[in-house]
């Protein structure tokens, strides 16, 4: 049985299929049959031993004090960083008691009982939105994000100075303001904020948001995709602007479980079909739960036919708002639908 969740208040079921779909803020779909999707761990490219630097950097960007002897300890003593940290503490407390509390209540009420046995969460057109992906799918161990924005790089600690911290922290506030104030990233803002104005890509913001939301960064590795959809370590010396994908491993609070989010900088329109390596990688992971949130209605367009087809044919559940897959595809496809809003 397919299932879809939508936040608009409608729903449907077809016992011929064992799929789940959900439309977020418009509808939710859940799996209702006994057959389980095959699961497997995401393939891992061989990598060097993890370092503490990614977690140090994540905490620094998030306004959270790091190790006393860490590489950012002197910068954390500057007045601009301390003001940024204090302001962020207050803002975050408000979010936790406001919009995040509502999301958590929705997740517990509408999604917690949905068992899809999916291998991972697929979040196309995601930007760096690890916040809501983790909130809606708190038990997921693997996430695959994708979009046009560049991967980005982690600047070395030596590139920051006390003299530049006022400017740096103002930029960080700018970068995070959209997800905090609106609950989503605006495409037009990301186009310049994550192409040099704030960061040179999404990785720093992904780390910032993971750290602020109670996660520890275990490791960060850059990868490239082979034509047959396998991950390989990126060639040494690859310029930051040429990064194809990044893998971030993280833990939540005291939970020892290591979770993974991949971000792929790729064309998901015509490129999804013309360059099938990414689709092959997704297929190698098994079947996903799919999240589409603030997707600019791109999945309504003909140019995204291949991506939409992948979502409909492979997802066990789709959680989306009305910017995702057009509603008619679910009514015609025999999905179980729950709508909200």
Give the label of every model feature segment.
Residues 35-42:
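Cleaved targeting-peptide boundary
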Residues 126-137, 144-145, 182-204:
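Short, thiol/selenol-centered motifs that function as redox-active sites or metal-ligating centers
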Residues 207:
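Sequence context surrounding c-type heme c attachment/ligation sites in exported
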Residues 178-200, 211-215, 219-293:
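Mature extracytoplasmic/lumenal regions of exported proteins
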Residues 42-174, 263-341:
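Non-globular targeting/processing and membrane-anchoring segments
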Residues 31-32:
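C-terminal motif of bacterial Sec signal peptides marking the signal peptidase cleavage site
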Residues 4-21:
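Bacterial N-terminal signal peptides that target proteins for export
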Residues 20-28:
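Sec-dependent N-terminal signal peptides
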């Amino acid at each position: 049985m397919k299932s879809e969740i939508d936040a608009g208040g409608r729903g449907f079921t077809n016992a011929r299929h064992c799929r789940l779909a959900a439309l977020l803020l418009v509808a939710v779909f859940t799996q209702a049959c006994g057959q389980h999707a095959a699961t497997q761990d995401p393939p891992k490219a061989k990598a060097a031993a993890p370092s503490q630097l990614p977690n140090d950097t994540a905490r620094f960007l998030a306004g959270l004090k790091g190790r006393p002897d860490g590489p950012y300890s002197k910068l954390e003593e500057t007045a601009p960083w301390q003001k940024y940290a204090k302001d962020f503490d207050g803002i975050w407390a408000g979010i936790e008691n406001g919009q995040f509390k509502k999301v958590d209540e929705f997740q517990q009420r509408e999604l917690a009982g949905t068992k899809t046995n999916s291998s991972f969460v697929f979040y196309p057109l995601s930007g760096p939105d690890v916040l809501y992906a983790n909130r809606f799918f708190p038990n997921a161990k693997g996430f695959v994000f994708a979009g046009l924005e560049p991967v980005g790089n982690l600047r070395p600690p030596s590139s920051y100075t006390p003299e530049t911290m006022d400017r740096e922290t103002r930029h960080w506030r700018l970068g995070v303001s959209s997800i905090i104030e609106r609950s989503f990233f605006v495409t037009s803002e990301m186009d310049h904020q994550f192409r040099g104005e704030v960061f040179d890509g999404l990785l720093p913001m992904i780390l910032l948001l993971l750290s602020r939301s109670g996660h520890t960064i275990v490791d960060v590795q850059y990868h490239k995709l082979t034509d047959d959809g396998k991950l390989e370590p990126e060639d040494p010396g690859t310029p930051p602007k040429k990064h194809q994908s990044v893998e971030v491993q993280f833990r939540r609070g005291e939970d020892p479980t290591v979770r993974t989010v991949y971000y792929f900088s790729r064309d998901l329109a015509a490129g999804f079909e013309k360059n099938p390596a990414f689709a092959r990688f997704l297929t190698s992971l098994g079947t996903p739960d799919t999240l589409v949130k603030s997707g600019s209605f791109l999945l309504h367009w003909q140019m995204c036919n291949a991506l939409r087809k992948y979502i409909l044919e492979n997802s066990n559940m789709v959680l989306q708002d009305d910017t995702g897959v057009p509603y008619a595809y679910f009514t015609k496809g025999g999905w179980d639908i729950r709508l909200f809003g």
